[in-house]
Structures are given as structure tokens and as C-alpha cells.
Regions:
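Peripheral, non-transmembrane regulatory/ligand-interaction domains of membrane transport proteins
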Residues: 1-182
Length: 184
């Protein structure tokens, strides 16, 4: 199920999802997982790669024995799912595989982005080696801030992967926990 905040209550009921808490995308400020008695609840706070320090995609998701509910007020999750459908012959016939593909889709452009940072830093290093140091600090500081932001985000995703792999609620098949190990 993919729903907006307004549709969340209905989607949760249809999926027989019991969540003890408020469902609010406005409170999403980082990536995390929480095991509850009846479901796993998680959030994604994904930096927009063209503006790492700016606004983010905010998504809530809930997993129980049979279903996944994704709450997203933008069309970001729908676009990810459409890309999964276009690019994957095995789109996610299990919840574990779907979660792996979903996270993989929003991380798919990260390597390219990190490569751009690497090129920028290498160009700056060459200038410094050539004795051109004017403006170096002003150029490097925003890059450093963006890389620190991305590092925090990736640390959160790794923690989330570990929590999924721990399978505290026993919602996932042991043989499929390997998908979460790849994320971690």
C-alpha cells in the first residue's frame, strides 16, 4: 500500500496494521526503525542530491506479517516503485526483496553523486598543488558540510539495515535476511 498522510488511516486499516503512535510526516527528521508488538515502523529522511543541505524526501513505512504500508505526500515513493517495475524482472515478490529494491532505488544515484564530490575535491587539490590557494577554504567548507550530512544519512541507513536484519519481531524469513545485510 502507498498512501498520503490523509489516506494513512484507511491504508493502515486495510493492511490490518496496528501502530501505537501518531502518523506524521512533519516529524520525520532522520532514518530509523522501531519494533512494536504488531508491526515494524520506520522513517526515511532522504537528502535531495542536488541540494543536500536543503529539503528532504520524508517517508514513513510500516511492516507487519503480510503487508507494507508506505506513507508519502510526494510522488517520490511511486516513482521508485515504477522504476523497480521497469528495471527488475523480480520486482519484490517478498517483503524483504521489495524493501531491498526500494532502498536500492533511492540510493542508486548516490555513487554518481559521491563521484562528483571526489572530482571536485581532486580539482581543488590540483589547484592547491599548483599554488592557487585563494578561496580554498570557502570552496571546501560547503563540500565538507554536505559530505558530513551524507555520512550521517548513510550511518542511519546502515543502522536501519542492521535492525531489519535482527528481525526482532520474526516478520522475515531467516533465509531472506541477507537482503538487509547488504544494506547494513
Amino acid at each position: 500500500f502507498v498512501a498520503t498522510s490523509k489516506e494513512a488511516k484507511e491504508a493502515m486499516e486495510l493492511a490490518e496494521m496496528v501502530y501505537e503512535g501518531d502518523i506524521s510526516l512533519q516529524t520525520v527528521s532522520f532514518c530509523r526503525m522501531e519494533a512494536q508488538q504488531e508491526c515494524l515502523a520506520g522513517s526515511f529522511c532522504i537528502p535531495k542530491l542536488l541540494d543536500v543541505q536543503g529539503s528532504r524526501y520524508r517517508i514513513l513505512f510500516f511492516i507487519n506479517q503480510r503487508h507494507i504500508v508506505i506513507i508519502d505526500d510526494n510522488d517520490f515513493s511511486w516513482r521508485l516503485i515504477m522504476r523497480i517495475r521497469q528495471n527488475r524482472t523480480k520486482q519484490g515478490e517478498t517483503r524483504e526483496h521489495f524493501i531491498y529494491n526500494f532502498i536500492g532505488q533511492f540510493m542508486s544515484r548516490d555513487v554518481e553523486t559521491l563521484g562528483r564530490y571526489e572530482s571536485l575535491i581532486m580539482d581543488m587539490e590540483e589547484k592547491v598543488m599548483d599554488g592557487v590557494i585563494e578561496g580554498f577554504q570557502n570552496e571546501i567548507m560547503p563540500i565538507r558540510k554536505e559530505l558530513l550530512t551524507l555520512r550521517g544519512y548513510y550511518d542511519q541507513l546502515m543502522d536501519m539495515g542492521k535492525e531489519l536484519e535482527e528481525n526482532e519481531n520474526g516478520f522475515f524469513a531467516k533465509k531472506r535476511l541477507k537482503y538487509f545485510g547488504i544494506i547494513a
